[in-house]
């Protein structure tokens, strides 16, 4: 039986899908059929290569050992020509092929690139190391690169689509295109090879699209006629402006007729000089009132130069895109507004744009001693003019003088305490029997205080309820003294220990009568007559009250020297005990004064560097703190011992109970929340501390705080209330700019904020403002 050879003896089969047969040869011998194929893939050098594989594939259908004897193992040939059968009489010789990369002999399949041979595993990319036998590759500087690395390092992108260019390319004006990407700008059709391309400086046009451009109407604008006078421009220079030609003397301002030789401003195709343009169409700066040229900063309906838009608090310019607050004609930084708000909360009094002024008027009996004027928006109006203001405006926007009580606000300062002590206030009993001279002095001082509300530093009081119940009742007051009393007597209440209660500043009598001195400008209080019997009974009651305030119910002799003349009571201490302490205090006080002076100068130097309201606020607090410490050092053992302080002159006079101008305490309502000028919810009554003399200061309401608006806010759609930055959003006059959310319907409010209005009011201020900013209602 004939023996057949295995494939291992004849060679390996290898082929490529993209291979093509370049030559074939058939050899027939006694029933045998042999095919020899040379598989080779050739491409133009310089383009993308596919690995050149060349192998001799021998397909042996049937071999007869008598006709053909194998001479050895058939291997892949690297010769570009077909290897013919070896001569059986000569031994076969194979050339040794070495790999170009590793230098080892090549066995089995070999890749040939041009004249170099590689193992399949050795033919890889120089950069990423990927296999190049299965895909295309590029040769650059003797190195073999894959497509991605070559394009990334040395590739050229198409100017039209941005992709890498391979194969055929089109180069025009130094730019490279794909053939399909180099197209007409107007009709988008690719340019045919050899076609003429028109480039007008921006676009590439084909012949069809470039023909209308040559005969466009623009060429008529550059005619030889002057656009000003209409005559031909012959010899001489022509001025080209506004796409027209002009004589040099015909290019004039449309408004003033001045010949324009330098800069000009065009409006609707007509030239203007800068002066006339600003006068006709210019925009003025709200700060410097000069016309704005160039960049303009717009805030609401107001316009500013970038250098003129400064914060009214810190005087710093606003940068582009910075947030600002607009209040009236002033602009604020958000941080400066917060510091101003804090400073106003710390002030004991607050001034407002709406205040009451007092001017000297007539002093005729029965007429007011001062004429009341109201200041509204920097304009002083007489009360007759105020009557012509609409009712709503009069109630909510200005103060009504007939509802204002001119009650001074007493602080706990050291000067006020000395003044009260000098007026004869008793530390233990407020109202000892006064003398006529002392009472007149007290009365003059109190009237001076109550009538000095129009001064610059005087406190200004707020609006309050315009239906007080106490202001319409007859006013009665019991005034002890040597003068005959007028009006109905009002006995003072007694404590359980039979001691009389004396009114303090916070507990003034509800009914009293003061003789008319022109204080009340609207009505004259009635005068009540007193019968002789009632007068005698009243005199007896007054004596009981008067003498009950002295030891043994006996008034001391005015000529008698007080027994106690020292700060220490009930008896003077020994000098041996208090002497060293007094010396140490006197010596230490001088050192403390020097130290305080040095610290104060250092603080002023540091704080003056902070050119802001916050720095001034800190300086003011430090100075007030030092003054309080200094007053505490000067204070005696007891706040105000009667007839014991040697440096305070003794006096037998006593002051009247504290009262305001018309004698009524301001009615304060605590049943409602109040809103300050920033829209914050605050308590109805300010918390007051007890004064050093044990009395409560007169309660008052802050300036600018009134009863809540009883009118229901109008409801507007959310789109009308929304604040945007793209365009000018004019908010209606009926809308409160600081409380835009109040004009939303309850269901819309809940849909936007996810809560009710009452729940929203209970949130802190920063949280409410943040939610309003997100909803574009801030």
Curated annotation (Swiss-Prot):
Phosphotyrosine found at: 373, 396, 439
Biased composition (Polar residues): 423-434, 449-474
Keyword Phosphoprotein among record annotations: yes
Compartments it resides in: Cytoplasm; Cytoplasm, Cytoskeleton
GO BP field: animal organ morphogenesis; axon guidance; cilium assembly; cytoskeleton organization; lamellipodium assembly; positive regulation of transcription by RNA polymerase II; transcription by RNA polymerase II; visual perception
Secreted in keyword set: no
Domain spans labelled LIM zinc-binding: 97-156, 156-216, 224-283, 283-343
Cross-link (Glycyl lysine isopeptide (Lys-Gly) (interchain with G-Cter in SUMO2)): 620
Region span, Disordered: 339-370, 414-510, 552-597
Extent of Low complexity compositional bias: 360-369
CDD domains attached to this UniProt entry: LIM1_abLIM (cd09327), LIM2_abLIM (cd09328), LIM3_abLIM (cd09329), LIM4_abLIM (cd09330)
Tissue expression: Detected in liver, heart, skeletal muscle, brain and retina, where it is concentrated in the inner segment and in the outer plexiform layers.
Modified residues (Phosphoserine): 216, 367, 422, 426, 431, 435, 452, 455, 458, 498, 587, 640, 655, 677, 706
GO MF: actin binding; actin filament binding; metal ion binding
Record domain HP: where: 710-778
One Pfam family per UniProt: VHP
Annotated GO CC locations: actin cytoskeleton; cytoplasm; lamellipodium; postsynaptic density; stress fiber
Keywords assigned by UniProt, alphabetized: Actin-binding, Coiled coil, Cytoplasm, Cytoskeleton, Isopeptide bond, LIM domain, Metal-binding, Phosphoprotein, Repeat, Ubl conjugation, Zinc
Residue ranges that the Swiss-Prot or TrEMBL entry lists as coiled coil: 590-614
Phosphothreonine: residues carrying this PTM: 433
Entry function: May act as scaffold protein. May play a role in the development of the retina. Has been suggested to play a role in axon guidance.
Assembly with partners or alone: Binds F-actin. Interacts with ABRA.
Protein's UniProt name: Actin-binding LIM protein 1
Organism listed in the record: Homo sapiens
Gene: ABLIM1
């Amino acid at each position: 039986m004939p023996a057949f050879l295995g494939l291992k003896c004849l060679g390996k089969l290898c082929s490529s899908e993209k291979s093509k047969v370049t030559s074939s040869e058939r050899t027939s011998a006694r029933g045998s059929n042999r095919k020899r194929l040379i598989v080779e893939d050739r491409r133009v050098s310089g383009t993308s290569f596919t690995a050149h594989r060349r192998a001799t594939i021998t397909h042996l259908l049937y071999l007869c050992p008598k006709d053909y004897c194998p001479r050895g193992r058939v291997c892949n040939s690297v010769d570009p020509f077909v290897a013919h059968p070896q001569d059986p009489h000569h031994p076969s010789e194979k050339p040794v092929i070495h790999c170009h990369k590793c230098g080892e002999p090549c066995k089995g399949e070999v890749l040939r690139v041009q004249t170099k041979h590689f193992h399949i595993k050795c033919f890889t990319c120089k950069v990423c190391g990927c296999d190049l036998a299965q895909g295309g590759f590029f040769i650059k500087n003797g190195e073999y690169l894959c497509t991605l690395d070559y394009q990334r390092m040395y590739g050229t992108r198409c100017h039209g689509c941005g992709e890498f260019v391979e194969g055929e390319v089109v180069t025009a004006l130094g730019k490279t295109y794909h053939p399909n990407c180099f197209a007409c700008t107007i009709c988008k059709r690719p340019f045919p090879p050899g076609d003429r391309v028109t480039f007008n400086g921006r676009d590439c046009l084909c012949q069809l699209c470039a023909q209308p451009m040559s005969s466009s109407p623009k060429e008529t604008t550059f005619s030889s006629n002057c656009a000003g006078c209409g005559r031909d421009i012959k010899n001489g220079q022509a001025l080209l402006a506004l796409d027209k030609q002009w004589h040099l003397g015909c290019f004039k301002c449309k408004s003033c007729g001045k010949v324009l030789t330098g800069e000009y401003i065009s409006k609707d195709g007509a030239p203007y000089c800068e002066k006339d343009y600003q006068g006709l169409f210019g925009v003025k700066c709200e700060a410097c009132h000069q016309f704005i040229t160039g960049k303009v900063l717009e805030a609401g309906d107001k316009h500013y130069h970038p250098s003129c838009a400064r914060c009214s608090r810190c005087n710093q310019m606003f940068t582009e895109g910075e947030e600002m607050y607009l209040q009236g004609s002033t602009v604020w930084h958000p941080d400066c507004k917060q510091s101003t708000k804090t400073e106003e909360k710390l002030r004991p009094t607050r001034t407002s744009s709406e205040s009451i002024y007092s001017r000297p008027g007539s002093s005729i009996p029965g007429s007011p001693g001062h004429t009341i004027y109201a200041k509204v928006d920097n304009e002083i109006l007489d009360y007759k003019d105020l009557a012509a203001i609409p009712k709503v405006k009069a109630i909510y926007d200005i103060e009504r003088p007939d509802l204002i009580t001119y009650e001074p606000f007493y602080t706990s300062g050291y000067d006020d305490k000395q003044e009260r002590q000098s007026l004869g206030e008793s530390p233990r009993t407020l109202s000892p029997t006064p003398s006529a001279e002392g009472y007149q002095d007290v009365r003059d001082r109190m009237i001076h205080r109550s009538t000095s509300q129009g001064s610059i530093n005087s406190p200004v009081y707020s609006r309050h309820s315009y239906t007080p119940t106490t202001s319409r009742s007859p006013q009665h007051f019991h005034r002890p003294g040597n003068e005959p009393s007028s009006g109905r007597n009002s006995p003072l209440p007694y404590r359980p220990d039979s001691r009389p209660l004396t009114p303090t500043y916070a507990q003034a009598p509800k009914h009293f009568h003061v003789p008319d001195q022109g204080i009340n400008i609207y009505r004259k209080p009635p005068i009540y007559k007193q019968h002789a019997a009632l007068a005698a009974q009243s005199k007896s009651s007054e004596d009981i009250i008067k003498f009950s305030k002295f030891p043994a119910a006996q008034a001391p002799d005015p000529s008698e020297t007080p027994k106690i003349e020292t700060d220490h009571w009930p008896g003077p201490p020994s000098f041996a005990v208090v002497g060293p302490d007094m010396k140490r205090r006197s010596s230490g006080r001088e050192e403390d004064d020097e130290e305080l002076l040095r610290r104060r100068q250092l603080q002023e130097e540091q704080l003056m560097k902070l050119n802001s309201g916050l720095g001034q606020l800190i300086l003011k607090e430090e100075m007030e703190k030092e003054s309080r410490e200094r007053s505490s050092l000067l204070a005696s053992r007891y706040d105000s011992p009667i007839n014991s302080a040697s440096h305070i002159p003794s006096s037998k006079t006593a002051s009247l109970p504290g009262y305001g101008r018309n004698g009524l305490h301001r009615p304060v309502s605590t049943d409602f929340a109040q809103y300050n000028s920033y829209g914050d919810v605050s308590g109805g009554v300010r918390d007051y501390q007890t004064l050093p003399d044990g009395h409560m200061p007169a309660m008052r309401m802050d300036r600018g705080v009134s009863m809540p608006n009883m009118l229901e806010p109008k409801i507007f759609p959310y789109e009308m209330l929304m604040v945007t930055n793209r365009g000018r959003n004019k908010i209606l006059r009926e809308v409160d700019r600081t409380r835009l959310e109040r004009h939303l319907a309850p269901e819309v409010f809940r849909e936007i904020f996810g809560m009710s209005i009452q729940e929203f009011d209970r949130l802190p201020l920063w949280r409410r403002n943040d939610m309003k900013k997100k909803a574009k209602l801030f």
